[in-house]
Structure formats: structure tokens, C-alpha cells
């Protein structure tokens, strides 16, 4: 958005007030992360012209996303239909021949940019993400050389780094004079391949990335914490399988 000259407004860090607001708008069956999402949307009301909520269906037949990611935009639009909030979205659905780059270019064009400018903005953003991810992986791998107890914390990035539900766990490990290693410090394509060493039939791409991180790090750490946002459906199945297949390795 910044490359397109559009000002960005970021919701505040998660806190109890925001979580309570999200619980108010979400149904009980939603996972905690979904409830926090609705809380963040409500916090942006009146503070921006529109809230960006991508609709991410899949990254191909072997890249299925949790159904919440596909439905977030529609749920948000309907939940806040009587509020002063507008939404913009893009559809990432490789099975329907709409890859991520095309989806974001179409979004940029819908916001008034030329196709060339939208493509340039996407490519610069993707390159910046790649550089940041490479630096993050190098930082976490360097922590493996620490002589203290090392704990691999396995969870989705939106949970791991949330100030209210994930960061306290990472800080708690550090306060115990141990070293937390975050599971997202992996090359995502390599992690998906490595996940096959644990299970070959997991449909969700993000779950396979978690499995791949365990395959990469489990021999170099002293313990593993599985961080799950209750009642996440995919995680509830994957975690049990992880425990059974990793505990004796």
C-alpha cells in the first residue's frame, strides 16, 4: 500500500479489551485467533477509509488453507454490515487460476493504480518480505548455538508474535533462562518438503510448514511447545499426530 502512495493504519497491539470485543462479534465456535481478528477490525472503526481483509483459498491443490482464511472477508463484511467500516479484498486461489501476484495486482488496479505500478509494488513488497524472512531464519539458527536449554515454540506466526497470547510465552521461556526458537524461521518450500518425513497426508499448507519446522529443528532443541489457538480444527488433529510421531525420536 505504501508503494502505491496509500497511507496504512495498523490496529493496536492485542489486549484484553480488544479480545473481549472480538469475542462479542464472533461465534463461540470460532478459534481464538478469529476472535482476535474481529477485535482488531472493531478497533479500526472510524480510523481508516477501509480495512484490508484478503480472501485466501489455496496455493494450489497441495496448498489448501484453513477455511477461516477463505471466509474471513465475507464474515467481516457481514459481521460489521451495520458499522461505519468499509472493506477491500483480493482473492488468492490458484485452483481458480488466480495466483497471489495476480490477486494483488488486481487489488492495486482497483485502488486506482496502473497495472505496471501495482506489479512493481507487489514485487518490491515480496522482495522485502523475502529479505526479512531470510534475516529471521539466520537469527533463529544462530540461537541454536547458545549453550542454554532451547525450546522450539511451534505455532502460526499470527499467534507466536501476538502481544497478548504468544509473546508472553516467548518472554516466559527467556525469563527461565532458556532460549525460545520460533517455528516460522524456515524456508517455507523446504519446510513443506521436510514435512513429508513426519506425515505425507496433511492437507493444510500452514500445518505442513509447522511439521517442516519440527523436522528441521527437533534434533537441535531440548523440548517443543505446541502453541494452539483453541479450538483450531487443523491444529487439534495435527498436534496429536505430532506428539505420537515425535515423542520417541
Give the residues covered by each predicted segment:
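An N-terminal assembly and electron-transfer interface module characteristic of large anaerobic redox
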Residues: 2-249
